Design a protein with these regions (language model features):
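Active-site glycine/GP-rich loop and adjacent strand/helix microenvironment
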Residues: 1-276
Length: 276
């Protein structure tokens, strides 16, 4: 059974309560919202497994989902060009399926970067598709290869998906250089305050706006914690001069696919740049 991502949350909860699924496959952001509905007592289902993908699953989001649903959580990474590219092991590490594909983390000149380095983007070669070969295709994601062996014993390489290269924020510091802020780091900082519905808007050159959804679960103490932690992080990166605003909104505009678009870049003409 499939349910449209455009459904209102109340409608989705009603459908799920009636259907009582054993397995749910969805985006991490939607799983967090369903977890919130379960904690409130509105969603009354007991799935055995949650299959998550399409977005980066942060540690705080995972905890929120686990606290609401006492079931197995399976994280995966994939794209339209190859699904799935990586599966999660019992130690919550993603392992790339390198017997079926080649992943190349590269710099802006499309040269391979070292293991452990954040690449500019990643190229994919699909070894399984004989109908429409995909060779060194730029998927636009930043993937870090971890050279350390995994406790699970898998020989497949460990990877960490940072996010889209378009989601990286680069801010001018006081010395005239640029400081790079990774989307996964920024999301983790906000989620640590217990807030999961948000967007970060980058206004060049030194202004950021965090948009939060008006809801009862977002208490004033959580919002203040979010602001404090975010400012502390900016200060630690030498960006204490950055102007940070908080904007409360009734809802957030998602991407065309239903994924939770987190980072928006506002161009000088006021147009919002979003790729999801």
């Amino acid at each position: 059974m499939q349910f449209a991502c455009s459904l209102l949350i109340d409608q989705l909860v009603q459908h799920l309560n009636a259907f009582k699924p054993d397995i749910i496959a969805t985006y991490p952001s939607m799983a967090v919202e369903l977890a919130s509905q379960a904690v409130l007592g509105r969603l009354r289902i007991t799935p055995s497994d949650l299959l998550l993908g399409g977005e980066t699953l942060g540690h705080e989001s995972r905890l929120a989902i686990q606290n609401a649903f006492t079931c197995q959580i399976h994280n995966q990474y994939g794209a339209s060009e190859f699904l799935p590219m990586a599966w999660e092991c019992a130690f919550e590490h993603l392992h790339a399926n390198t017997d079926w594909l080649i992943l190349e983390p590269v710099d802006s000149n499309y040269r391979l970067v070292k293991d452990g380095e954040v690449p500019f983007t990643t190229l994919i070669t699909n070894l399984a598709n004989y109908v429409q070969p995909v060779y060194r295709y730029d998927i636009g994601d930043q993937i870090i290869f971890n050279p350390e062996p995994c406790k699970c014993g898998s020989s497949f390489p460990r990877i960490e998906v940072i996010g889209r290269k378009d989601d990286v924020i680069r801010i001018l510091d006081k010395k005239g250089g640029y400081v790079t802020l990774l989307p996964l780091t920024l999301s983790t900082i906000i989620e640590q305050s217990g807030i999961y519905d948000f967007q970060i808007h980058h206004h060049s050159p030194n202004k950021l706006t965090i948009k939060l959804v008006k809801k009862q679960s977002n208490s004033s103490s959580q919002i203040q914690k979010c602001i404090s932690q975010f400012k502390n992080y900016l200060g630690s990166m030498g960006l204490a001069h950055v102007h940070l605003e908080i904007e409360m909104v009734s809802n957030l505009n998602g991407g065309r696919s239903g994924k939770a678009k987190r980072i928006f870049h506002e161009e000088k003409n006021g147009k919002i740049n979003s790729t999801s």
